[in-house]
Swiss-Prot record:
InterPro entries in the record: Dehydrin, Dehydrin_CS
Similarity annotation: Belongs to the plant dehydrin family.
Region listing for Disordered, in residue ranges: 1-68, 115-228
Gene (UniProt): RAB25
The species this protein was found in: Oryza sativa subsp. japonica
Name of the protein: Dehydrin Rab25
GO aspect biological process, one term: cold acclimation
UniProt feature, compositional bias: Basic and acidic residues: 169-187, 212-228
Pfam families: Dehydrin (PF00257)
């Protein structure tokens, strides 16, 4: 008949199997649990030794090969030390020996690599991406800045090219009724005297008459300046 004892959570488990061999307790996941406190004889002051069948390792786990897959052999404390697979102690905050390359070390993702990434002071550094790597967001932001700077000074001409962007004042003039005709008439009035230079006073008088006719046409087109 196997001997039963009560565990940490009150569940009975056998300390010795049917052959008399000690059996270490396990939790619900099958991992060995820490040994329970030894019974204390308060009357005689005697403390019973712990069960030799259970040996606690790091984090109170039994055995040296029982760490959780996601648990680290590097403790989070400033002075907490761990033992490398080669038997040499090393610390998280520097001052110790880094485990040799190729040795298996238990660490959280991005904290310690298999080769043991260290800084200039011997501290274990988290593994990061390559410094020259640019993300997609940075590329889009850079392309957006370049396109916005180019679009601010030029615009598409509708024929696959770029042309200088017009100012707001020029756009307003284009939208006003009769503005194109007035500009064409002004240009015609300025070029008429230039074409008749050196031909005498008759051409100059004809240019004035032509300019006067243009002004009258403009007045006729303006509202309120029709027939008097």
């Amino acid at each position: 008949m196997a001997e039963h004892a009560t565990g940490v959570y009150g569940h009975p488990y056998p300390r010795v199997d049917q052959y008399g061999n000690p059996v270490p307790p396990v939790d619900q996941y099958g991992n060995p649990v820490p040994d329970e406190p030894a019974p204390r004889d308060t009357a005689a002051g005697y403390v019973a030794p712990p069960d030799p069948a259970v040996s606690t390792g790091d984090y109170g786990l039994a055995g040296a090969e029982a760490p959780h897959p996601h648990e680290s052999a590097v403790m989070s404390g400033a002075a907490a030390a761990a033992v490398a697979p080669g038997g040499e102690a090393y610390t998280r905050d520097g001052g110790g020996v880094v485990p040799p390359a190729g040795e298996k070390t238990f660490a959280y993702e991005g904290t310690v690599s298999a080769a043991g990434v260290t800084g200039a002071s011997g501290q274990l550094q988290p593994t990061t991406r390559e410094e020259g790597h640019t993300t997609l967001g940075e590329t889009l932001r850079r392309s957006g800045k370049s396109s916005s700077s180019s679009s601010s000074s030029s615009e598409d001409d509708g024929q696959g090219g770029r042309r200088k962007k017009k100012s707001i004042k020029e756009k307003i003039k284009e939208k006003l009724p009769g503005s194109h005709k007035q500009e064409e008439q002004k240009q015609a009035g300025h070029t008429a005297p230039a074409a008749g230079t050196g031909t005498g006073t008759g051409t100059h008088a004809a240019g004035k008459h032509e300019k006067k006719g243009i002004v009258e046409k403009i007045k006729e087109k303006l509202p309120g300046h029709g027939h008097h």
